């Protein structure tokens, strides 16, 4: 995997146990197209942060279609979910699931309700504010597209990982998401510094690029014009690992 290091030395972020007064960072993992690898990226990114000593929570925003718990291997441990917290039916600590393999990693599963409007701006904001008191990083695993869950996932973001496949349709949809981040995120509405955007290119196959069946890294960079954080090669190992 080719990668560019995300800035983990920012003074606004502390490692777990650091006594200095600093605030958490909210990172959304998003895209305009489904099936590009957002949830796998969310799980891997959150795990990487936790292994580096940052207390990290990853939240599934895909209401009605949750699968972060499956990827994280905790599907049988879900008792309460994100919507339960928002509706005051459970506390954050009742809903959070501690990862069995990493002490600094916690998961909040999405609700299986069919009500796509179950997430509210005030409710999500309240939960994010509470989590900021305890965590170094809050990773928001967004559903695809621009439905309510996706908008809520990006609204409070400080940084964004935009996951795209090297296909024209995927890149075009990612460009639309970048437009929403720059105009509809809370930072944009409040006149603050814009959300810091990074690109993750997934399912990259150099042979198909050479044959003209896929866009090259440079092609994608020319279109989206944001820094490339990492390139994940197309591999059957990813599918096997998730199963």
Show where each model-derived region lies:
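Short, glycine-rich, amphipathic interfacial segments at transmembrane boundaries or analogous
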Residues: 231-241
């Amino acid at each position: 995997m080719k990668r560019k290091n995300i800035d983990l030395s920012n003074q606004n972020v502390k490692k777990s146990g650091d006594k200095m007064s600093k605030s958490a960072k909210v990172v959304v993992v998003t895209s305009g197209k489904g099936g590009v690898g957002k949830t796998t990226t969310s799980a891997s990114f959150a795990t990487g942060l936790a292994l580096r000593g940052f207390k990290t929570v990853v939240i599934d925003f895909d209401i009605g279609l949750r699968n972060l718990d499956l990827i994280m291997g905790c599907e049988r441990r879900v008792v309460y979910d994100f919507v339960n917290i928002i509706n005051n039916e459970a506390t954050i600590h009742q809903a959070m699931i501690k990862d069995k393999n990493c002490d600094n990693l916690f998961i909040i599963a999405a609700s299986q309700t069919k009500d796509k409007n179950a997430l509210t701006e005030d409710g999500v904001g309240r939960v994010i504010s509470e989590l900021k008191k305890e965590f170094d990083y809050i990773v928001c695993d967004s559903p695809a597209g621009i439905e309510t869950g996706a908008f809520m996932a990006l609204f409070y973001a400080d940084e964004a990982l935009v996951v795209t496949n090297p296909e024209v349709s995927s890149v075009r949809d990612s460009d639309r998401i970048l437009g929403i981040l720059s105009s509809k995120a809370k930072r944009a509405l409040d006149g603050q510094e814009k959300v810091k955007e990074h690109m993750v290119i997934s399912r990259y196959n150099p042979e198909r690029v050479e044959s003209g069946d896929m866009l090259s890294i440079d092609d994608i960079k020319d279109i989206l014009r944001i820094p490339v954080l990492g390139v994940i090669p197309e591999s059957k190992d990813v599918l096997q690992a998730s199963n």
